[in-house]
Amino acid sequence: MSDFAFKLYEYNVWANQQIFNRLKELPKEIYHQEIQSVFPSISHVLSHVYLSDLGWIEVFSGKTLSDALALAEQLKEQTEAKEIEEMEDLFLRLSERYILFLQQKEQLNKPLQIQNPSSGIMKTTVSELLPHVVNHGTYHRGNITAMLRQAGYASAPTDYGLYLFMTKTEKA
């Protein structure tokens, strides 16, 4: 796997943490507050992202997509009900699992055959799918930003350019 793909995943971890940091600054009830949006609440968005990320690492580790989807369905209500600090901890532990997995270079380009119940078999690799994991998180962080604005709050900046400036800018 290229350094870029790994750095992209590190960006994803950073961006998620920016969202958690911002949410913890706001009134506690905003996390579960119902908002007229794509998801009924911010807690539902973060649950969805977490369960999707969990599903992909399960698939990368050898589970079937059907098993990963079943696990997500089994954990859905439980994760939606968690408080922000509990979800932050779940995301942290999941990111540690990803990083340990991604450090196993031999796994990254091993062929995967993923059976999707509705669209057949996809032949791919972890390296090819990892940008999807990051892109999916980016998309839903945008949902959270829109939901926060709708509720009268600013979000946290999470764009990749800012991440690069924060991690690559030399101190004068």
From Swiss-Prot:
MF terms (GO), sorted A to Z: metal ion binding
Name the gene behind this protein: dinB
Keywords attached to this Swiss-Prot or TrEMBL record, sorted alphabetically, are: Metal-binding
Protein name according to UniProt: Protein DinB
Does the UniProt entry include the keyword Secreted? no
Q: Which family does it belong to?
A: Belongs to the DinB family.
- InterPro entries noted in UniProt: DinB, DinB/YfiT-like
Query: Which Gene3D superfamilies does the UniProt entry name for this protein?
Result: dinb family like domain
Q: Does the keyword Metal-binding apply?
A: yes
List ligand-binding residues for a divalent metal cation.
H48, H136, H140
Its assembly, as annotated, is: Homodimer.
